[in-house]
Amino acid sequence: MTGYSTNMRIKLPLFCLILQFITIILFAVFVRYDHESDARGWHDELKNHSTANADNDFYFRYPSFQDVHVMIFIGFGFLMTFLKRYGFSSVAFNFLIAAFGLQWSTLIQGFFHGFHDGKIHVGIESMINADFCTGAVLISFGAVLGKTSPVQLIVMTLIEVTLFGINEYIILNIVGAKDAGGSMTIHTFGAYFGLIVSRVLYRADLDKSRQREGSVYHSDLFAMIGTIYLWMFWPSFNSAVTAHGDDQHRTVLNTYYSLAACTLATFGFSALLNGEGKLDMVHIQNAALAGGVAVGTSGEMMLTPFGAMIAGTLAGIVSVLGYKYLTPVLDSKLKIQDTCGVHNLHGMPGILGAVIGAIVALFATADIYGDGMDDVFPMIFDGSRTAKQQSLYQFLALLVALGFAIVGGTVVGFILKLPLFGTPSDAECFEDAVYWEVPGGEGHQQLTVVVNNEDPDTQA
């Protein structure tokens, strides 16, 4: 039964190759270079002396893109390697999701934001936005880590990316909310989407795999690599698509100080909540990053450096409390099995970030922003909204993100329950040997242990 149900020999090639073929066809029909990457278009502008090579958006955006790309493939990937028997899958399934997600999101977001004359025009900013979209899916992946097959993850990516594009378009273009760092569109949406999927896929007998859900010394060390990369590059993540100049500069500053304050709060509360005053590596790996999430919406606003520190401190406290007290309740009472604790790192800090953004928007005045209001709050600048109205629309955007996450996660969860995606059994969760050739004789030994429902750590 195990060999048949989880065998990827037909399922995985079928889904990967068919979806890649469809994507290539769609790119051939719709996708073209934008004017800054098209040879003829760009050189025509140079010939007309209307621009210079140094003005190409590539030189302004590519450093941020590099940082975001590292976060997606190394940061998120290694952050999930804390599971002692799931390191291959954590990094590699992250790789798989991101590789497909960035292609599909280029199409979906292109239809909403870059569709001109019947074509999708791509450039450096569309690459950044595609990575952002992929980030939301990777957050959802964290909630179901170890309990899903690679085929299930591809299907989830296909649908979630599509819903992300619709949700983002409604929030940014119809509601008119500001969310450059994605507190709502990326973190809140991705976290609660994943949590709802996890709830629908609830495993009553997951205790059969609980012995592998924990970490060991070296797996926690690998996860800290992901933490450090994410922590270092989060200012680039929040500022990557903000306006050039003071907006981007201010976003980096706010994120920088929020993360620093969050880290101190995390260390402090981690020790405080332990009876022996010891630190918990789960808190340090995750909660120390919540400060970046908490200023995703307000980072480009005039939050002030001390305001950013307050936001980061609150995020760190909320996240640690969530890991300590709320995660067990979600599991035992609400039947939400959140492997990575995305509710504590992305969900609650994402909501906090949305609320902070709405509060800061409420106090936006011409005296504070001057002509810079046009970049941050263009509708307030042109008089079509008051600051109070903008604040209310920020709250509305949060509700939209939550609505899409809950409804979309429910639908996707039931789709993933279909018995054709090679999902692992309750006794096979959190185990690489189910889907991977593990080096040496270890893989066969561990798979035998899994089938017999034994604790691998007790085997000679």
UniProtKB/Swiss-Prot annotation:
One GO biological process term: ammonium transmembrane transport
Gene assigned in the entry: rhbg-a
Cited Pfam families? Ammonium_transp
Q: Where in the cell is it found?
A: Basolateral cell membrane; Cytoplasmic vesicle membrane
Segments passing through the bilayer: 11-31, 63-83, 88-108, 126-146, 151-171, 180-202, 221-241, 253-273, 284-304, 306-326, 348-368, 395-415
User: Could you tell me what this protein does?
Assistant: Functions as a specific ammonium transporter.
Q: Which residues face the membrane's Extracellular side?
A: 32-62, 109-125, 172-179, 242-252, 305, 369-394
Q: Which family does it belong to?
A: Belongs to the ammonium transporter (TC 2.A.49) family. Rh subfamily.
Q: Outline which residue ranges sit on the Cytoplasmic face.
A: 1-10, 84-87, 147-150, 203-220, 274-283, 327-347, 416-460
Q: Does the keyword Glycoprotein apply?
A: yes
Indicate the principal place this protein occupies in or around the cell. Answer: membrane
The protein's name in its UniProt record = Ammonium transporter Rh type B-A
State whether keyword Transport applies.
yes
Highest taxon, organism lineage:
Eukaryota
What GO MF terms are annotated? Answer: ammonium channel activity
Residues the record marks as carrying a glycan: 48
One annotated Gene Ontology cellular component of this protein: basolateral plasma membrane
Which key words are in the record?
Answer: Ammonia transport, Cell membrane, Cytoplasmic vesicle, Glycoprotein, Membrane, Transmembrane, Transmembrane helix, Transport
Q: How does it sit in the membrane?
A: Multi-pass membrane protein
Query: Taxonomic lineage per UniProt?
Result: Eukaryota, Metazoa, Chordata, Craniata, Vertebrata
* UniProt-listed InterPro entries: Ammonium/urea_transptr, NH4_transpt_AmtB-like_dom, RhesusRHD
